[in-house]
Curated annotation (Swiss-Prot):
Source organism of the structure: Mycobacterium bovis (strain BCG / Pasteur 1173P2)
Enzyme class: transferase
Lineage: Bacteria, Bacillati, Actinomycetota, Actinomycetes, Mycobacteriales
Catalysed reactions, as listed in the record: L-methionine + ATP + H2O = S-adenosyl-L-methionine + phosphate + diphosphate
GO molecular function terms attached to this record: ATP binding; magnesium ion binding; methionine adenosyltransferase activity
Record text on cofactor binding: Binds 2 divalent ions per subunit. Binds 1 potassium ion per subunit.
Gene name per UniProt: metK
Keywords: ATP-binding, Cytoplasm, Magnesium, Metal-binding, Nucleotide-binding, One-carbon metabolism, Potassium, Transferase
Binding locations of Mg(2+): D19
Record protein name field: S-adenosylmethionine synthase
Length: 403
């Protein structure tokens, strides 16, 4: 333990980070297919490297025009991120785009289309007919540390990353380039955030920028101070924060020219910044029949409503599935001693209020829509800039009644 207290760190990255370019492409392809055919089955993985994009995976869809237009969808998203010139290391208009997509395996499709409950047990409920697209375990988490009920380190790291992109795109700091990362270290006493210890901001920039005279003061004033003023956290002292701006020095070579990128390689950034556990499954490029995505969203929905209902100050919930089965094989609730009701009662109430069969999750959260591209950067949970169905607090009263 540090003399400053217990130090916890989370990181975020901007939409121009190579891995996030891949997440954005995968989710843009998903959205394009869902917009034309909401029943599309999509599992799309992307790789980017110098001058090249490779999009592979499995898709079953009736959206023939959207499928044929995937190359243009890829290029449009890269350009929207800001890679529009070889001077920035990547150009969506001229990069090579290779598509290698096949159909979903019929062996997987049979378990999703006709779940074990319907196929073997003769269940008549339509929601018993859609099985989980894979086995796996998914976690959801919520904590009353911020208005969005997220851990403070990841919430602050995401705000800094979003602000980096804002000042680049709106011309406040036009010399910034799309690639960037942020990291936040916060000191805790008795699980209360008391001091902002260290902030690291690394951002790609134009070659002719003086780091000490221009970049460092601009980032402090236009990015960090703006975010901290907006945050205005009650218990967090930011007066002595150590700020490290581009601690390696210049950062001109970035994006896919600096590092290759892959879909699904920022799963901790996507979720809770390491503060809560993770089941291991990535989100981007997957349609909601994949419980890696839809069930993780559902568990965030569960956790957030439990905390908002005042049943616990923080809660972590786990659900698990067997491939081809509709009903979860496991549900686990951890309240870390912060509960205001018996944890057994909380778990029972969750089971009564939330239907965690994949078909029910898709129905209740209305997931067969093109809503996924905005989630590809800056986190899937606790977003303050976009409205997402799994962030709604619509089950608070139901949980209170069930208790």
């Amino acid at each position: 333990m540090s003399e400053k207290g217990r130090l916890f760190t989370s990181e975020s990255v901007t939409e121009g980070h190579p891995d996030k370019i891949c997440d954005a492409i995968s989710d843009s392809v998903l959205d394009a297919l869902l917009a034309a055919d909401p029943r599309s089955r999509v599992a799309v993985e992307t790789l980017v490297t110098t001058g090249q994009v490779h999009v592979v995976g499995e898709v079953t869809t009736s959206a023939k025009e959207a499928f044929a237009d995937i190359t243009n969808t890829v290029r449009a998203r890269i350009l929207e991120i800001g890679y529009d010139s070889s001077d920035k290391g990547f150009d969506g208009a001229t990069c090579g785009v290779n598509i290698g997509i096949g159909a979903q395996s019929p062996d997987i499709a049979q378990g999703v289309d006709t779940a074990h409950e319907a196929r073997v047990e003769g269940a008549a409920d339509p929601l018993d007919s859609q099985g989980a697209g894979d086995q796996g375990l998914m976690f959801g988490y919520a904590i009353n540390a911020t208005p969005e009920l997220m851990p403070l380190p990841i919430a602050l790291a995401h705000r800094l990353s979003r602000r980096l992109t804002e000042v680049r795109k709106n011309g406040v700091l036009p010399y910034l380039r799309p690639d960037g990362k942020t990291q936040v270290t916060i000191a805790y006493e008795d699980n209360v955030p008391v001091q902002l210890d260290t902030v690291v901001i690394s951002t790609q920039h134009a070659a002719d920028i003086d780091l000490e005279k221009t970049l460092d003061p601009d980032i402090r004033e236009k990015v960090l101070n703006t975010v901290l003023d907006d945050l205005a956290h009650e218990t967090l002292d930011a007066s002595t924060v150590r700020v490290l701006v581009n601690p390696t020095g210049k950062f001109v070579l970035g994006g896919p020219m600096g590092d290759a990128g892959l879909t699904g390689r920022k799963i901790i950034v996507d979720t809770y910044g390491g503060w809560a556990r993770h089941g291991g499954g990535a989100f981007s490029g997957k349609d909601p029949s994949k419980v890696d995505r839809s069930a993780a969203y559902a568990m965030r929905w569960v956790a957030k409503n439990v905390v908002a209902a005042g049943l616990a100050e923080r809660v972590e919930v786990q659900v698990a599935y067997a491939i081809g089965k509709a009903a979860p094989v496991g549900l686990f609730v951890e309240t870390f001693g912060t509960e205001t009701e018996d944890p057994v009662k909380i778990e029972k109430a969750i089971g009564e209020v939330f239907d965690l069969r994949p078909g029910a999750i898709i129905r209740d959260l209305n997931l067969l829509r093109p809503i996924y591209a905005p989630t590809a950067a800056y986190g899937h949970f606790g977003r303050t800039d976009v409205e997402l169905p799994w962030e709604q607090l619509d089950k608070v009263d139901d949980l209170k009644r069930a208790i």
